[in-house]
Amino acid sequence: MMQSKPGVLMVNLGTPDAPTSKAIKRYLAEFLSDRRVVDTSPLLWWPLLHGVILPLRSPRVAKLYQSVWMEEGSPLLVYSRRQQKALAARMPDIPVELGMSYGSPNLPEAIEKLLAQGVTNLVILPLYPQYSCSTSAAVWDAVARVLKGYRRLPSISFIRDYAEHPAYISALKQSVERSFAEHGQPDRLVMSFHGIPKRYAQLGDDYPIRCEDTSRALRAALPLPAEKIIMTYQSRFGREPWLTPYTDETLKSLPSQGVKHIQLICPGFSADCLETLEEIKEQNREFFLHAGGEKFEYIPALNDDEGHIALLEQLIRHNI
């Protein structure tokens, strides 16, 4: 009888290898070519992507990455590595590997490392608290493509999401309360989630429902009146309508409503990255202050916070 050996594959979106136009062009080409991310016909999308979007966006995005790049590398990779290391320390009997859907470390290498260690029960943990076809489902597709090359397949446990998990809500609550203790209670707490095109939700993606589930659970857990907690969506791209209300437009409008002090958390990001450190902490802060706001504090992602790592361990052990 074959003895079961579990192994964990942690997956996040990915990051360029360097804050340069060349590296970012390579990364964005892979990311934006995934039909789960952009479902426009390749006949229309490929020339637009390679002829217009990549040449124009890559230099601009490179400057943004340079503003947040850490000594150890890209923030997303740095924090994801710390998560992997902390999780492995809590589960020394179970191999834990990190793979990115796009860029490095890539999924084929991570899966190969696990299978080479004799893993027969592969637990896949996409680091997306709220399921979306453009993130979690893309992980499923990528893993399936890798495993097509193997004769002998492991059993698979795929953690779809954890939007309402009590340990996740507790970790978020503690993070918010630490910020309140340090900076005082704000006029508004803004919960900003990454957006997706409205059309994706209309076609069946339950991502906005899962974001609302997280928001409702966190509202109930916090010592702040529900009307002082706002849910928004950020990072829209392209011309079609995305989920609303938009974070940037909301922050620009709040000061005219008498809101002078806000704190902002991004519950859907398991690790800090360009979208939190530059788009939110820098750009959106400026939008709010320029519109007449007085105090803005960004509440960091859970990163390698002890409560976050404990949550991830619970998710994994429940699926072994």
From Swiss-Prot:
UniProt catalytic activity: heme b + 2 H(+) = protoporphyrin IX + Fe(2+)
Binding site for Fe cation: H194, E275
EC id: 4.98.1.1
Gene Ontology biological process terms, A to Z: heme biosynthetic process
Pfam family, one: Ferrochelatase
Stretches that traverse the bilayer: none
Family matches, as InterPro entries: Ferrochelatase, Ferrochelatase_AS, Ferrochelatase_C, Ferrochelatase_N
Protein name: Ferrochelatase
Organism of origin: Yersinia pestis
Organism taxonomic ancestry: Bacteria, Pseudomonadati, Pseudomonadota, Gammaproteobacteria, Enterobacterales
Gene: hemH
